[in-house]
Amino acid sequence: MNRLAVELPGLSLKNPIMPASGCFGFGREYARFYDLSVLGAIMIKATTKEPRFGNPTPRVAETPGGMLNAIGLQNPGLDKVLEEELPWLEQFDVPIIANIAGSTVEEYVEVAEAISQAPNVHALELNISCPNVKKGGIAFGTVPDVAAELTRLVKQVSAVPVYVKLSPNVTDIVAMAKAIEQAGADGLTMINTLVGMRIDVKTGRPILANGTGGLSGPAVKPIAIRMIYEVSQAVSIPIIGMGGIQTAEDVLEFFYAGASAVAVGTANFVDPFVCPTIIADLPALLDDLGIGHISECIGRSWKTGAHAVHCRA
């Protein structure tokens, strides 16, 4: 029995560990270090209809507990992803989750319909955290009704299950999650980055050319845990958790909060082997805690009658 196997809508995962979108590109650089087939899945970099060159530099800044980024969804565009990146990934025995983004509802729908037809794309990750709605400038990811309508329209055209990536930069993330579930989402991924800023003490100016950026890394982990804990008790669709994961112990904490799988982001920049290391470490950790299968950990922190976990002597 594979103690790490996880079944999610559209995804049969050999283990619940995957690199998060935006921290792994399309896998080419990491394939020089290890066989990508060891991963549970790969969340590829966000894809838009046309190529995007991203924001001006500098667009990355280190922080004491992680990093800020303002990349700006740089990507080669839909055609190149379909013609080059996804075919290259077919050599690996790993399901692909395609992260899609757009500036308009129409762009989201067009990209979703096209990329969901690729043979190795098993699910979509709907990135509603960055773009704005045409004719109004309302962020897709911060207004429940708008997020729900976008989810509904993408679901209508997608050939694979749709997971929606939630922004933590909202007043009520539970309300957002419920609206998206009611619109037909198959799952959630959370959390995306928090808006932050660093200022250069010598110049008095923001370090990032964009001014603000997305904070990720260990600093956001307690926020991610809290939000997953709340959302997982309010919805019935599965959650892929992310936000500051570095170790196998971090993975279990996310599972206890209510996640059914996890994505590792910023840690890939620190250690390119972090994902296979976590995968290798998980079985021994389960043994130490007397846990038979990783799925036993889902929601343990809040489920009625859940037994406490005690390390074996």
UniProtKB/Swiss-Prot annotation:
Binds 1 FMN per subunit. One of its GO terms (biological process) is 'de novo' pyrimidine nucleobase biosynthetic process. InterPro entries: Aldolase_TIM, DHO_dehydrogenase, DHOD_1B, Dihydroorotate_DH_1, Dihydroorotate_DH_1_2, Dihydroorotate_DH_cat, Dihydroorotate_DH_CS, Dihydroorotate_DH_I. Its EC number is 1.3.1.14. Pathway: Pyrimidine metabolism; UMP biosynthesis via de novo pathway; orotate from (S)-dihydroorotate (NAD(+) route): step 1/1. CDD domains: DHOD_1B_like (cd04740). It catalyses: (S)-dihydroorotate + NAD(+) = orotate + NADH + H(+). FMN binds at residues 21, 45-46, 99, 127, 165, 191, 217, 243-244, 265-266. Its cofactor is FMN. It is found in: Cytoplasm. Its main location: cytoplasm. Gene3D superfamilies: Aldolase class I. Belongs to the dihydroorotate dehydrogenase family. Type 1 subfamily. NCBIfam families: PRK07259.1, pyrD_sub1_fam. This is Dihydroorotate dehydrogenase B (NAD(+)), catalytic subunit. The gene is pyrD.
